[in-house]
């Protein structure tokens, strides 16, 4: 049995710069990983079978991103003659990241499967090939595959590695799940934030264009942010529902965590520019 980190991410800022004819939104965002997340346990099989041993309530196994990622890797590697005969896996997950939380849990799980099985099966696919497979599963998967903090443009697929300060964060889940389309389909979502260079953006105060909609539509998000903002600069991550406050030290973050109201599910984690998954591979 092998054990593989599947870390969370934060969007340190997120700006919606337009909407394409196909309905997808163009954006500028800054991804950073957390030293906190799910863990995947993978046992290679030799009969070509993929088994997910920890099903998710309400999600058919074949629809789960973990299984879809494994099958896609199997297909691409097989078609290019790089899949050893009988390659398969038993996969289980220790889930800590909430669904619909804006922490990238599902995308991170898919990326960890691609990276881990490519390694365990010895397929030899390049990072670019794995990222291309990942993009077909979700716009956030490639950044997890590449494993470095990044400035993202387009629909999130154009990635430039960056090294923002590695701060400490108090991340709070307000107890609701926000499906991404709920935010992106809202007619009041800002969709015309001017594009700026990464150098300019890094000098500006960070914000998230989705936050105003999430706060308006989900009172729990509004309450969580209102509480966090009493202590430190705080924002929504992704389309929510998680919010986060940033601190210079772990002790400062933990002091605030101790005062968190009971209805708020919160944790402290460090921002890291190299994914914990990729640290394992070094």
UniProtKB/Swiss-Prot annotation:
The alphabetized list of GO BP terms reads: isopentenyl diphosphate biosynthetic process, methylerythritol 4-phosphate pathway; terpenoid biosynthetic process
Pathway named in the protein's UniProt entry: Isoprenoid biosynthesis; isopentenyl diphosphate biosynthesis via DXP pathway; isopentenyl diphosphate from 1-deoxy-D-xylulose 5-phosphate: step 3/6
Q: What is its EC number?
A: 2.7.1.148
**Keywords of the record:** ATP-binding, Isoprene biosynthesis, Kinase, Nucleotide-binding, Transferase
**S-S bonds:** none
Asked if the keyword ATP-binding belongs to this entry, the reply reads yes
Q: Does the keyword ATP-binding apply?
A: yes
Assembly and interactions?
A: Homodimer.
Q: Which NCBIfam families match?
A: ispE
User: Function of this protein?
Assistant: Catalyzes the phosphorylation of the position 2 hydroxy group of 4-diphosphocytidyl-2C-methyl-D-erythritol.
Q: How is this protein named in the record? A: 4-diphosphocytidyl-2-C-methyl-D-erythritol kinase
Species this protein is from: Salmonella paratyphi B (strain ATCC BAA-1250 / SPB7)
Q: What is the lineage of its organism?
A: Bacteria, Pseudomonadati, Pseudomonadota, Gammaproteobacteria, Enterobacterales
